[in-house]
Structure formats: C-alpha cells, structure tokens
C-alpha cells in the first residue's frame, strides 16, 4: 500500500543526501580528486499499490525526485548525473498487497538486506468491507480468531513471513490497538513463533494530517527483525530506552503475552459479567 510513493520518495532523497555527504567526506579525508557518481538507483525501490492512478503518480514522483537529487548532486559535487533519456523508475506494482506474494514483487535471498516500511490502512474488524474481510481470510485464515484482528495485521504477518530467516527488516506506522487488549495474543504469538522479534518501537503518539475533520488516531511505529542479540530501543516522546527485548505491549525486557481467560483467576474474587469494553 505505497500510495503515491511518499515513503519511497522521502527514503530515496535521504539516502541520496547521505551519499553526497559520504562523497564529500571521502574527498576531504583522502585529499584526492575523485569523480563521484551516484550509487543509489530508483531500481532499488519497490512498492505495491491497489489504485492504478496512485501507481502512476508514484512512478512519476520518483522520477522527479531523482531529477531533484541529481541537481543537488551537481551543486555539491560539480558532477551532473545523466537523467535523460528516462531510465527505469522504481518497481511499482499495481495489485493487492494483501494477496500478492511479496517475494515475487521483490525477490530476495537470505543474505540480501531488504527494508520494508509503510503506513498501511488501519481498519478495525467492524469497519472492514466484504473485500477487506476476504483479504484477511486469505492472509490470516490460519490465525486463531483472525476475524477480530485489525486490517493492518495482514501487513505485519506478510512482512514477518518475508523477512523470516534473512537479514531483511520491516517497520510500519500502525494503529496502537495491535499492541493492546486481546489483539496482542492473536497477532503477536504467531509472529514470535516465527522467530521474529520487535527491533524498535515508538510508543503511542497522536497522528495528525491536513484533512478536514480528520479523526484523532493514536499510532505506534513497530520494527520487526529476526531474533538477535542486538540492543533494542523504545522511543517515547523525546526519551529513548535501550533494552534487550521489547514486548508486544511495547514495554522493555520481556516478551510475555497475556492471553484471555474465560474464568476468574481466583475463587476469592467474584465472577466478571462483562469485560472492560465500553458499551451501552
């Protein structure tokens, strides 16, 4: 669900800016007149989008971004890379990301480093239309109680499936509901069973945009990787906490999952008639 390519464009530009800084640093360190050339190519960028018009917009936007960064490359390093004739742009595939095999869109080996990122749609189980429910059944039908999962859960599962047993990583902006309540056990238990862990997390923050009457949505950012001994980081506001593990509740030093129970935990407390769900 790359939309019109915002994530791809920003990532491409930031990498080109980093590349320029590296070339300038190499010149200063070696004091040798080198002929720089860009190594970051649009052919390294992939996206899947359902809307055909958005696909075309993403392709065109990447070409424009390439031209802008080539101009900046010339201003900083006095070399103008060739732009015309137009070379192949990013691999933007028009299709349903929930149903396509991601490895056919961007084939990779366990040794390749592929970074998946995005801002997939958030839709609670009661907000999904018939086609979206079918998407979920196809992708998550083997999950216990998959019908109660948020639509974005599909992306987390397919990303985990893609990066499993490889050097690749993934991260998504997501509704915070996947890290709260009974969705946690439904989604994260199968992901953790695939030897996947949370590499970093940004805890709940309010998502805002320029749309009129935009609903208040609280989001998280969650990174996925294969299990490793590397440090993990939890970012909350302006603070950053280093930890050895991150739970699916985005808390440090544990990966325990609290599953639902149909009976009380002690005979000394009364039976619960209804959970904490707000209802009339």
Put a short name on every predicted segment.
Residues 24-40:
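Surface-exposed acidic, glycine/proline-enriched linker/cap segments
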Residues 51:
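Conserved SAM/SAH-binding beta-strand->alpha-helix loop
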Residues 1-5:
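Class I SAM-dependent methyltransferase "Motif I" SAM/SAH-binding loop
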Residues 58:
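Conserved SAM-binding loop
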Residues 17-22:
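Post-Walker A helix-loop "phosphate-sensing" segment adjacent to the P-loop in P-loop NTPases
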Residues 90-95:
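Conserved SAM-binding strand-loop segment of SAM-dependent methyltransferases
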Residues 45-48:
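Conserved SAM-binding motif I beta-strand of class I
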Residues 9, 16, 55, 63, ...:
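Signature of N6-adenine DNA methyltransferases within the class I
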């Amino acid at each position: 669900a790359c939309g019109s390519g915002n994530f791809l464009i920003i990532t491409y530009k930031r990498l080109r800016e980093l590349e320029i800084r590296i070339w300038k640093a190499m010149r200063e360190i070696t004091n040798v007149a080198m002929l720089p050339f860009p190594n970051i190519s649009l052919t390294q960028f992939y996206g899947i989008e359902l809307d055909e018009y958005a696909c075309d917009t993403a392709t065109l936007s990447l070409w424009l971004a390439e031209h802008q960064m080539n101009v900046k490359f010339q201003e900083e390093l006095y070399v103008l890379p060739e732009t015309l004739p137009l070379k192949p742009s990013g691999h933007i595939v028009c299709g349903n990301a929930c149903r396509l095999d991601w490895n056919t869109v961007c084939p990779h080996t366990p040794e390749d480093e592929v970074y998946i990122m995005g801002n997939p749609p958030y839709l609670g189980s009661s907000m999904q239309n018939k086609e979206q429910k079918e998407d979920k059944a196809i992708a998550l039908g083997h999950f216990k109680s998959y019908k109660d999962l948020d639509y974005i859960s599909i992306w987390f599962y397919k990303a985990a499936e893609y990066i499993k047993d490889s050097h690749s990583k993934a991260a998504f902006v997501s509704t915070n509901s996947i890290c709260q309540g009974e969705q946690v056990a439904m989604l994260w238990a199968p992901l953790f069973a695939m030897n996947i862990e949370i590499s970093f997390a940004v805890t709940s923050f309010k998502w805002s945009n320029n749309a009129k009457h935009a609903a208040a949505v609280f989001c998280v950012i969650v990174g996925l990787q294969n299990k490793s001994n590397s440090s993990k980081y939890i970012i909350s506001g302006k603070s950053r906490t280093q930890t050895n593990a991150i739970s699916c509740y985005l808390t440090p030093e544990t990966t325990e999952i609290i599953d639902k129970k149909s009976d009380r935990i002690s005979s000394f407390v009364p039976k619960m008639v209804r959970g904490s769900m707000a209802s009339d």
